């Protein structure tokens, strides 16, 4: 969802989703579990009543660091590995671990069009720098990297093959995949995937594609910066 404040309304690009009906339980259940684990001792425990209905069309994945559970990372990898035609990713911070990187490259090698949309300049300059070493490997394998212009794209979304989508709080970086409390909804819905693809296509009109030629021509000073800042990746 959106951050709240004037800068986020005018200078950030985010994606919001509204859930109604039976699927609300997916988020409600996560809130109940989180509240009951971290609630103040003076506050009441919320009842855990179980699902009111079962549906595979909308499900939620929650990272729970206190239990060492990180299903969102597996959800991303599984969806990418299933792709046969296209993968469209939007993320604010893109620092994939080796398994996520390998799944993206494997998809591109089998003919899947993989497009990754990230901000050209995010609000975390260190995250921008430690992400850069991955660009060359991805570009050489045919993965498209698009740089969003004039605003901070903060969405965390992915669609696969026009049938599966996720919208949530998790970036593709170490903190989101292996550290933070995060929640992502996954949708098995062609209409929603089609809408997400329309939004992605519109976002590309405000982005520029990073080419392998441009990447290979970056300056020596830039390359030195990448090497020097690379060891700081575990911090972001």
Predicted regions and their residues:
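Charged, low-complexity intrinsically disordered terminal segments
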Residues: 1-236
């Amino acid at each position: 969802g959106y951050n709240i404040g004037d800068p986020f309304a005018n200078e950030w690009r985010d994606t919001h989703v509204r859930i109604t009906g039976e699927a609300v339980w997916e988020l409600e259940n996560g809130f109940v579990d989180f509240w009951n684990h971290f609630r103040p001792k003076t506050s009441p425990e919320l009842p855990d009543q179980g699902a009111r209905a079962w549906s595979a069309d909308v499900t939620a994945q929650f990272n729970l660091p206190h239990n060492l559970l990180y299903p969102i990372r597996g959800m991303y990898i599984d969806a990418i590995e299933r792709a046969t035609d296209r993968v469209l990713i939007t993320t604010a911070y893109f620092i994939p671990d080796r398994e996520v990187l390998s799944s993206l490259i494997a998809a591109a090698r089998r003919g899947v069009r993989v497009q990754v949309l990230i901000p050209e300049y995010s609000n975390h300059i260190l995250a921008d720098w430690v992400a850069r070493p991955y660009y060359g490997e991805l570009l050489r394998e045919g993965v498209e990297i698009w740089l969003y212009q004039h605003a901070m794209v903060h969405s965390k979304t992915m669609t696969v093959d026009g049938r599966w989508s996720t919208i949530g709080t998790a970036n593709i970086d170490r903190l989101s995949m292996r550290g933070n409390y995060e929640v992502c909804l996954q949708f098995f819905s062609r209409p929603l995937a089609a809408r997400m693809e329309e939004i992605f296509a519109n976002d590309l009109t405000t982005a520029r594609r990073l080419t392998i030629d441009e990447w290979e021509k970056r300056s020596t000073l830039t390359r030195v910066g990448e090497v020097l800042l690379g060891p700081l990746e575990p911090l972001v």
